[in-house]
Amino acid sequence: KSTELLIRKLPFQRLVREIAQDFKTDLRFQSHAVLALQEAAEAYLVGLFEDTNLCAIHAKRVTIMPKDIQLARRIRGERA
């Protein structure tokens, strides 16, 4: 478990700007703000995939499936 970022910075930054554009145009981001968003997003995704993998293992599978992600999110209380 390293602390290095898993997603390249520029593609993530473009994604953040693209999503933000839907809410307000001409937004500017400090580099530290984008980095904080990326660290939070990656931490969330890593945790979700860890839980998803546990769901697949519980079902006696080694391959994760969409239903594993759905179950993990439901157990976490993220989706009713």
Curated annotation (Swiss-Prot):
Keywords: Chromosome, DNA-binding, Nucleosome core, Nucleus. GO terms for molecular function: DNA binding; protein heterodimerization activity; structural constituent of chromatin. This is Histone H3.3. The lineage of its organism: Eukaryota, Viridiplantae, Streptophyta, Embryophyta, Tracheophyta. One of its GO terms (cellular component) is nucleus. It holds the Pfam family Histone. Variant histone H3 which replaces conventional H3 in a wide range of nucleosomes in active genes. Constitutes the predominant form of histone H3 in non-dividing cells and is incorporated into chromatin independently of DNA synthesis. Deposited at sites of nucleosomal displacement throughout transcribed genes, suggesting that it represents an epigenetic imprint of transcriptionally active chromatin. Nucleosomes wrap and compact DNA into chromatin, limiting DNA accessibility to the cellular machineries which require DNA as a template. InterPro entries: Histone-fold (IPR009072), Histone_H2A/H2B/H3 (IPR007125), Histone_H3/CENP-A (IPR000164). SUPFAM superfamilies: Histone-fold. It comes from Hordeum vulgare.
